[in-house]
Amino acid sequence: MIVLLAFIHRDLILDTHHIPYDYDTYHWPLFSEVASRVANRQGIGWDTSEYGGAPLLTNVNAAVFYPPHLAVLLAVRLTRLRVTLREFAFVELSHWVLLAVTSFIYLRVRGVARRWTVVSTGILLGSGALLSQSQHLGVIEIVSWLPLALLATEHAVDRRTALSGALLGLVLATMLTAGFLPQFVACLLFLMTWALVRVFQTGAPALRVLLVLAEGLVTALCYGAVIVLPLLHDRATYPQVDAPAAFPVQILKTTFAPDALGHLEGDPARYVNPTDITWSYYYIGAFAVVAGLASLLTRERSARGPQVVLIVLVLAGFGQTADALAGIARSLPVVGQLYRASPVPVLLCFAMWLLLAQALQRGRWPRAVILLTMVLISGGLLLTHAQIGSETARVSAWSMPAVAWIILGASTVALLSQRPTLILAVAVAGVIELVVVNSGGFWFSSPGPAQRWDERHVTSGYDAALAFLQQDKGQFRVAVDQAVMTDTWDNGWRVWGLDSISGFDPQHNGAWVTLAEHLGARQYAAPRRFSLDQLSSGVLQLFNIKYLVWRAGTVPPLPPGLTVAFTDDLYSIVRVATFRPRVYLTSRSCATVSAAFEQTSSRCRDVIRVQVRPSTAGHLDVDLPSGHGAGLLVTGTAAFPGWRAAVDGVSRGTRDAFGAVQAVNVEAGDERVVLDYRPVSTPVGLSISAASLSGLMILALYSQGPLARRRQGARAGRTDGSSSI
């Protein structure tokens, strides 16, 4: 199965892949940026590519403090090697191996026979939800620790010691630092529900168990303080959450229903999805099945629990398969929410894995019924993965689902027969299928427009557009339509080398979202996408945006002030006729949210230029012109709370302008303004994380004495017993 997983990652075995773009065009460039700074012994300051100018330490998806990433960064620091896509692929593949090992260990500890452990773990690794979530590195990294977290939870409930709570906290902290917070919250709910049911079934003292679990959670939060504090205090960048200010509500919303609760943000139309009806199976059922699973896997006292689990899973399987088929019939580029970052389907697969392994072991129901349930669930998941693969690999929209169903059906027959030879033959057929699909050498291979675009896009097709932009030596921003970034999002500009433009600073799109939400824009498409319906040329000026990039032939009707400056068969570049400087002085009354769109007053149109000294993304040094009056120094930098300002050497508070960008009030006669990004939460979080890790080490060392004496006493007891016989 691990070999099969290697085939779906680009550059490990073949040069094509099934994984959509987030994996190799978001997570890799982001981690590569961190690694390059470490290798060059630079500070891990600002990321000038992901989300256009976000602090790296407050971007949880960078996962700088995730222990396996720290190990890689240490190796990079010692060797000063560059993290290529191939090396990065091994980071994710190693977590697939970890998931296989931890799943195998858990089932063996639970007493499941070796053959059913292997079968169930193989089905888990090959489930469509996990495969389709391979593009989200954080999902795979967190889920790979989930079996160990399950063992640690059971150990904490059974032993109820400080050390067991600390061990649970250490596993949870590792999952937390991976950065994919909706998946972590969902897994945490899964584990806590599991612990609660186990308490009722074993008769353990509930209060003591609660204290141990609370110890584990506090330990995890303390160790993960370096990312938790920036999220809560510094409005850290988190792409799965649209409004960081509403962090707790947004995380829970994203966990249970990424698109179904849009009314929380005042715009239900923005979050309507035609597949939400079928997804009600998962939002209600995925966590409801935990009680039945717990009764199945721990000395069950009622036979109804497993039956409820089976019924819910069958309904979920029918719903998901119907959803996948309907999505493909509608020719959706992706099916339902599986393509999105929803953690619920992943947990559903995890629940299916536990149920399948234990049910096969006990033979409580006919194995044909159990495997049929598995087929219904994984069938929809696999169809979804196949549809995603048809968008990124060299296959047609129907060929991959057809092959997927053939392989899935053959696998079911093989498992029902329980003949090792037949199972091995189907596994070999699966390997051949992946090789053929990836290599594009079969008769159904038909590179479509999207694939031809991708081939030119990642080679040299952008050279002409890049050369045009590099001719302009001024300080400006480039905004990119989401359609251009189908494969690379905003960080594609860094891959292309656009950060080499003098003074270039990609637009922080979160500022656009904030501004649009302030103004109640009803049809704002999504984060990282702009719409000329809301962002007129006047608004573009405010953000120092001089050029906009579209795919050729997709430029919409342009409002006054925007003209097409460059076009070829791939790209069209639009120039904003008049745009404001990177930093300028204006009247304080002109920095309101309404002024961002209206710009009716002539005094608000006129700005005073300032002299910018050599600066970086986290440091801005400005000389003010002589004779200026009191006003507002407006920067093009997104307004993060971690900014500190000094005017003529005297500390002065910062504020936001237009509801989105950083600004400083200046008085007449002020000469120099220096802004530095120095968030308090980062060093405080680092201190708490380091202190908690030290505390765990002290607790572990302190516990070695009692544990050793306990083992010695147990050994002595066995010796005395044998001698008396």
Language-model features: locations:
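Membrane-embedded helix bundles of polyisoprenyl
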Residues: E92-R110, R114-F200, V212-L232, T237, ...
